[in-house]
Regions:
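Thiamine diphosphate
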Residues: 249-277, 491-499
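C-terminal catalytic domains of large/alpha subunits in multi-subunit enzymes
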Residues: 63, 72-73, 233-238, 267-275, ...
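Flexible, low-hydrophobicity surface segments
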Residues: 1-164, 182-185
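Short acidic, glycine/serine/threonine-rich loops at helix termini
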Residues: 79-84, 127-130, 195, 216, ...
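Extended active-site and interfacial segments that coordinate phosphate-rich ligands
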Residues: 16-20, 129-142, 219-221, 226, ...
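Short glycine-rich loop/turn motifs
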Residues: 103, 198-203, 294, 446, ...
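Glycine-rich loop/linker segments at domain edges
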Residues: 11, 17-20, 89-92, 161-202, ...
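Active-site-adjacent "gating/activation" loops or surface patches in catalytic cores
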Residues: 219, 457-479
Length: 765
């Protein structure tokens, strides 16, 4: 798909940051080097649960170049929460504050007990290795089931159950039992890591006015400012956060990670710059993971394929600290409710502490796990009833005018039926399905399909606010200051398209300055929940309309015209009745506004808007694969995602988002799993050699298609797209493997080892 100059949304154009990235001029956090900068390295626990009885750091302190060593005794005794959620005035709804900068009571393999600061990174690493600690080990808990046992050792005061909740539309069990056919399933999903290209790094120093500046690879600069203030008990305004280019986050950097520690260290060392940079192994052990879910599901379906009701009982493993905690399990149940809204639905969930590395936000935020269970059960019902898997979904899919059964919120745009129909045609579903019947050999083909629903922000659970400030420069170009966060997803590019379309200028005349500095940009919580373009759009559009109004008013004075007769097209003032005849360039107008001795001034506009709508996006995955029974190997032949994300703002970027999500979904389905010893809690594969991810030879040609149905609640007709592409992929692959082999496998990932075990039980090998 060709990228070209654009003047509006709906057009493909080159990313505004493309040249900086391909030329190497883009600066990431680790590229920042300052005079006198020091480096910090952690001393981490080799055990998953216990206490540090004593610590000996004499050898480490004697090493030349070591400046300081801090232990749990030296840090503030202030528990804080790290989840990147908008702040709330309701104390009962705030995230659990169960973290300290360092701890004597270690709760997972790799927990931090001390930190070394040295003049160079190698010295800091060597000194950290020289710190000797005597440990008192405690019983290790690795599963929610063990955590909830009566005799389970408490990981935190208050017990191992972090939170539980129940949602229901009524007597769901009775509805399921009354249906013609019932299906049950027990589903398990693994602990996985985000594996973003850039590791976690933070750099902090103290300014002349004693304020702390932090440069960090984060999705949530303005939330980082708040949490650092809370962790160190200093005013939030005394913290300044600079976000340079970010090499991916996928939810991991929606947690406040190393910023509080970097800020603490510089404050203790007289304000010198201190960098805290994690290795890849540390990213596995000490950042965040995807929550492992155990789901017991029931579903009732009539013979004609009508879904009468379903229920899900979820156990969520949040690991050693709360992080995003129960919000993941709760959100997963809420988001899937839109998918098949005309049936009874019950969802109960418990989130438990264990001695695993902490789980947090990851692309899909609970929805991939829940959709895996729902779409597996529905597919099993279709098989048992002899109904085409696409047909059973079409009969139950959300449609315009339906409502979320839990909240009653109306669905104003629902393109799921159109996605299924379009996908069926592009994929040649009937032809491929017919080719996969009655197979007996070692190589067996199967096709599968799965659907999803996903919302466009966090409202009403979280406050959704966004700000935008537009300034016209002397040459007529426009600077856009936004509190939103570009982390590689292309947000700045679509923001420039929004402003260009609304004001009436080329995209090349718009420069977006997203949250690169919390001191100068308007407020916005950050990049998460597929919210960025949806929530930022109203503020951007409002400010753009106001700026356009000011520009035309100034032009009317210059041209002695009524403002009603003028408009802006491609950066030129024109008469509404003769748009093909430019009267004045925006540059000429800007020069007059700045330098005329009497009239004008710098033309600017600002807006801050809270969003109180949250429409669902929909879509589906079609997959064709081959299973080698003898080798227990799955090869994907073709995969297609079809999305209803409303108006597509930039087709080229949208395609890239979908392909990236599909690749992650394939990894979750077939390869990825953190292998954790069930007895010791030790992570056995905290590196990119032993942790298996799909590489280019493992991925087929990724295909995407879109159904554009305007969302009337949206400023530009669009809905979420960032996270949805990953959601249905694993379920579609599982369903295709079932068709190929007749074996329904309900535990991810579908590795050769797991396939061997399941095929052996089924008598295939």
């Amino acid at each position: 798909m060709e990228a070209r100059e654009a003047t509006a949304t709906g057009e493909s154009c080159m990313r505004v940051d493309a040249i900086a990235k391909v030329t190497g001029r883009a600066r990431y956090t680790d590229d920042y080097v300052m005079a006198g900068m020091c480096y910090a390295k952690y001393v981490r626990s080799p055990i998953a649960h216990g206490y540090a009885v004593s610590i000996n750091d004499e050898q480490a302190r004697s090493l030349p170049g070591v400046l300081a060593i801090f232990t749990w005794e030296d840090v503030p005794d202030i528990p804080f929460a790290t989840a990147g959620h908008a702040w709330t005035l309701d104390e009962n709804k705030r995230d659990t504050a169960d973290r300290a900068l360092l701890t004597r009571h270690v709760r997972h393999h790799g927990d931090a007990v001390a930190i070394v600061v040295a003049r160079d990174e190698l010295t800091a690493e060597k000194a950290a290795q020289l710190v000797s600690i005597e440990w008192q080990e405690l019983p290790v808990i690795t599963t929610p089931e063990a955590a909830l046992a009566e005799d389970a050792a408490p990981i935190h005061n208050g017990g191992n159950l972090l939170k539980q909740s129940t949602m229901s539309t009524g007597n769901v069990q009775q509805t399921i039992d009354a249906a013609d056919y019932q299906v049950q399933g027990h589903y398990q999903t693994p602990v996985i890591q985000h594996c973003h290209m850039e590791s976690v790094t933070s750099l902090a120093w103290m300014e002349d006015d004693s304020r702390i500046t932090i440069v960090s690879s984060t999705q949530i600069p303005l939330i980082v400012r708040r949490v650092v203030g809370q962790a160190l008990d200093i005013p939030w305004s005394c913290v300044r956060v600079i976000k340079p280019f970010v090499g991916g986050g996928f939810g991991n950097k929606q947690d406040v990670l190393e910023e509080p520690m970097a800020a603490f260290l510089t404050s203790k060392l007289g304000g010198i710059p201190v960098k805290v940079s994690l290795s890849r192994e540390e990213c596995f052990l000490a950042t965040r993971t995807r929550h492992a879910f155990t789901i017991d599901g029931q579903m009732g379906v009539n013979r004609d394929g009508t879904l009468k009701g379903y229920s899900l009982d979820v156990l969520s493993n949040t690991g050693a600290y709360a992080s995003h905690g129960h919000s993941i399990a709760s959100a997963g149940g809420n988001k899937v409710a839109y998918l098949y809204p005309r049936c009874a639905y019950a969802y109960s969930s418990k989130t438990c502490y264990t001695n695993l590395p902490s789980a947090g936000a990851m692309r899909g935020y609970g929805a991939p796990q829940v959709v895996f269970a729902v779409e597996s059960m529905l597919d099993d019902a279709a098989t048992a009833l002899g109904i085409d898997p696409v047909e059973i979904r079409l009969r139950n899919a959300a449609r315009e005018g339906d409502a979320n059964p839990l909240t009653g919120k109306r669905i104003y745009s629902a393109g799921l039926p159109e996605c299924l129909e379009k996908g069926r045609k592009i994929f040649e579903w009937e032809k491929r399905r017919a080719e996969c019947q009655n197979q007996q050999g070692n190589l067996r083909r199967g096709v599968g399909v799965a659907c999803f629903s996903y919302t466009s922000n966090t409202w009403p659970v979280g406050v959704e606010i966004a700000g935008a400030r537009l300034l016209m420069n002397q040459d007529g170009t426009i600077n856009v200051q936004s509190g939103a966060t570009e982390i590689g997803q292309g947000a700045d590019t679509v923001f420039s398209q929004m402003v260009a379309e609304t004001v009436g200028v080329p995209v090349s005349d718009v420069r977006v300055i997203s949250t690169q500095d919390t001191d100068v940009t308007p407020f916005d919580p950050g990049a998460f929940a597929s919210r960025q373009s949806y929530v930022a759009a109203p503020a951007l559009r409002s400010a753009a309309l106001l700026l356009k109004e000011k520009i035309i008013a100034h032009a009317a004075v210059m041209l002695h015209q009524s403002a009603m007769n003028l408009t802006l097209i491609k950066g030129h003032i024109v008469l509404v009745e003769r748009p093909e005849e430019p009267l004045m360039s925006l540059k000429d107008l800007a020069m007059d506004a700045f330098y005329h001795p009497e009239r004008g001034g710098q033309l600017s506009a600002e807006s801050s808007i809270k969003t109180t709508t949250n429409p669902p996006a929909f879509g589906c995955t079609f997959v064709d694969l081959t299973v080698d029974i003898a080798l227990c190997k799955v090869t994907i032949n073709r995969i297609l995602n079809v999305h209803d994300s409303g108006h597509i703002l930039n087709p080229l970027l949208a395609e890239g988002q979908v392909h990236g999500g599909m690749g992650m979904g394939i990894g979750w389905a077939l390869f990825e799993e953190m292998i954790i010893d069930a007895k010791s809690g030790v992570v056995r594969n905290p590196n990119l050699l032993d942790y298996k991810m799909p590489t280019m030879p493992d991925l087929p040609q990724l295909e995407s298609a879109f159904v554009e149905i305007n969302e009337p609640q949206s400023a530009y007709g669009h809905k979420s797209l960032g996270e949805p592409p990953i959601i249905p992929v694993a379920a579609a692959i599982r369903n295709a493997v079932k068709m190929a082999t007749g074996v329904a496998i309900n535990t991810l990932p579908l590795t050769p080892k797991r396939l061997y075990e399941e095929f052996h039980l089924a008598g295939l090998i």
